[in-house]
Amino acid sequence: MEKDFQFTFLGTSAADFSLLRSTNCQDRFDKNARRASCMMINDNIMIDCGMHAMDSLRIAKKDIAKITDIFITHFHADHFNKGFVETIAEGKANPLRLWCRQDAKIAPMNNVDVIRMEEGTYYHVEPEMNVKAVYANHEESAFPQHYVFDLNGKKVMYATDGAWVSNRAFPYLRKNNLDVLIIDATCGDYSNDRRLAEHNSIPMIRLMVPFLKTAEIIRDDTAIYLTHIAPSLHKPHDETQELVKADGFIVAYDGLTFNV
């Protein structure tokens, strides 16, 4: 019997955070009080572990003792916190595995095994899960990469931070026929912002979708989730969801789950 994988959005914000988060939403998730982007697969695998990760894990009632692996998309503070990683690793019988780009510069951490990933190569993580990393178009000094999770033949891509699809990543993505694409949507429904060199806007994603289908990176039935939402650049959640309803996009929010 094939294993089901549950994905939980622990955070869906870019690095400008709503004041609601630190006022009346300290102990709960709210669609308009997003925390730093972070994700959980089942109860043992995290994607990113940034400045709000411990709060998000607490609110989601996740037991850090069960966490075996953390995949780091890049080393900006909203995605990686060394102290939090060491807190999660503390006391484990087996070292916590931290996955990152092959050339990442990272200080040693207690009880943490750093696994440096060769671009485009699948790594076996656990039964029924293999993962490959591809280059991300984001600030190079943060060693960015995106991930494609192969789960019993079903493929989920986590693509934040980063803009467009780079020619370096393209050979490893074409014909992947993703079941789910989770994509950076930092900027709102407009096309003139300095961040568009390393983040997506909604118009950029609309432009990409036909090409992604032509390249068989996605299919007509691929679920597309927008995450890494900058509150200052977007309308409130419900308005943003209505805005992309015709596109078939799903605007992710903290606490949202889906199964693969």
Task: Give the role of each language-model region.
Residues 12-13, 44, 51-52, 75, ...:
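Active-site metal-binding loops of divalent metal-dependent hydrolases
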Residues 50-99, 177-181:
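Active-site metal-binding motif and surrounding structural segment of the metallo-beta-lactamase
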Residues 58-61, 122-127, 169-175:
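Short amphipathic alpha-helix with an adjacent loop that forms part of the alpha/beta core around
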Residues 164-257:
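Cap/insert and terminal regions of metallo-dependent hydrolase folds
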Residues 2-60, 143-160:
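Conserved beta-strand hairpin/beta-sheet module of binuclear metal-dependent hydrolase folds
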Residues 45, 69, 154-158, 180, ...:
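Structural motif
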